[in-house]
Curated annotation (Swiss-Prot):
Residues 255-277 are annotated as: Disordered. It catalyses: N-acetyl-beta-D-glucosaminyl-(1->4)-1,6-anhydro-N-acetyl-beta-D-muramoyl-L-alanyl-gamma-D-glutamyl-meso-2,6-diaminopimeloyl-D-alanine(out) + n H(+)(out) = N-acetyl-beta-D-glucosaminyl-(1->4)-1,6-anhydro-N-acetyl-beta-D-muramoyl-L-alanyl-gamma-D-glutamyl-meso-2,6-diaminopimeloyl-D-alanine(in) + n H(+)(in); L-alanyl-gamma-D-glutamyl-meso-2,6-diaminopimelate(out) + n H(+)(out) = L-alanyl-gamma-D-glutamyl-meso-2,6-diaminopimelate(in) + n H(+)(in); N-acetyl-D-muramoyl-L-alanyl-D-isoglutamine(out) + n H(+)(out) = N-acetyl-D-muramoyl-L-alanyl-D-isoglutamine(in) + n H(+)(in); 2',3'-cGAMP(out) + n H(+)(out) = 2',3'-cGAMP(in) + n H(+)(in). This is Solute carrier family 46 member 2. GO terms for biological process: cyclic-GMP-AMP transmembrane import across plasma membrane; negative regulation of T cell apoptotic process; positive regulation of nucleotide-binding oligomerization domain containing 1 signaling pathway; regulation of T cell differentiation; T cell homeostasis; thymus development. Residues 45-80, 132-140, 196-207, 303-321, 370-371, 429-441 are extracellular. Down-regulated by the anti-inflammatory drug methotrexate. It comes from Mus musculus. Belongs to the major facilitator superfamily. SLC46A family. Its main location: membrane.
Amino acid sequence: MGPGGTCPWSSRLSGFRVRTWIEPVVASTQVAGSLYDAGLLLVVKESFKSEAGGSSNYSANQSLVEYQEDQQQKAISNFNIIYNLVLGLTPLLSAYGLGWLSDRYHRKISICTAMLGFLLSRIGLLLKVMLDWPVEVMYGAAALNGLCGSFSAYWSGVMALGSLGCSEGRRSVRLILIDLVLGLAGFSGSMASGHLFKQIVGHSAQGLLLTACSVGCAAFALFYSLFVLKVPESKPNKVHPTVDTVSGMMGTYRTLDPDQQDKQNVPRNPRTPGKGKSSQREVVALLFVGAIIYDLAAVGTVDVMALFVLKEPLHWNQVQLGYGMASGYIIFITSFLGVLVFSRCFRDTTMIIIGMLSFGSGALLLAFVKETYMFYIARAIMLFALIPITTIRSAMSKLIKDSSYGKIFVILQLCLTLTGVVTSTIYNKIYQLTLDKFIGTCFVLSSFLSFLAIVPIGVVAYKQVPRSQQGECAEKQRS
């Protein structure tokens, strides 16, 4: 294989080729992000600790500690509602424009701008800890992060750079490697976060070391992308007339066209153009519905889970919280490893359903968790929970024209973003209302939504069956 068909790491490691690797940026950014997520939750928890003090009129029949804990949980939940609204809506103003500028002028624009927002938000948390600012200052930090594009602009830029300089045959390996780096970096940062969140001798602020490390990693990522990272030259793709594959975040997937038959074994019959386009539009619409319903379940569970583990019966400390967040990154790794295995023998729809069943079953068990080991069993059942959204996005790319990629994916991303904002608000309110009754209500709801999302995907799977097989099944049922 000549140099034109290889990825940067498979040929001679020249200085320029090493500088085209996006992995150092992904790793440092994700470590900073995992430290920030844990630090923000713990700092907010400590900030509301004093405000959740008991009342002199409060009944002595109930424990004062439980009352303070409930008030603290509600305060954190209300903070999360506003914070997620700001962080979720502000990128809508800039993410699309940054993507357009990156395509037109320079590929690093969206990455560098988004990482500037990451750095500013991390600095905001550091200043809040050092100067004991009110916790509301983090709303401004979230707004700055969002106006710089946030994760939407950043990850689209990472995927673009990861795909450049690599032939289509090796592109899936490159993108999987980026996913692996992301998962391992997040796991490492989360594992360390609880240990870093402690008082420094001579300083009363908790979380100073944790937030300082987050700022340092974010600053390294920004300066590396500005002064070291180079945009690789694009490699020409080889045309494979009998193979219809598209690279996604988790590898290369097979076609999902319901009207496409085996090109090698089945002779092509003329089809009515309008019928084929109509069928594809129906499949894309069903995939949209499945993605949105599943995203409702996933986003709601993640938002509530952080509060759930801080309250009885688990009542985790800082170190345990870091370990619990790290388990989420293990799920990220197992999900794309699952895609690597499943894509060899299953259709896209089958992989999506496997992921939805995995998440729904784990969420249902999570609702009845009483001990820490039960929490990790539930998370282990969710090991394929990240497969559905990525596979849906990859499957949709096979059903639309290249010229429509941007429009369709922007619409999908906007739908998922708005869904996440609405879901966060609704789930946090439900959590507050059911805090004293059944704390696992949100997880039961997520499980139901996850199983409900299988319905539109099942319809897509039915449409995927060749017409000849559907006719044979109908004849067998008549006989």
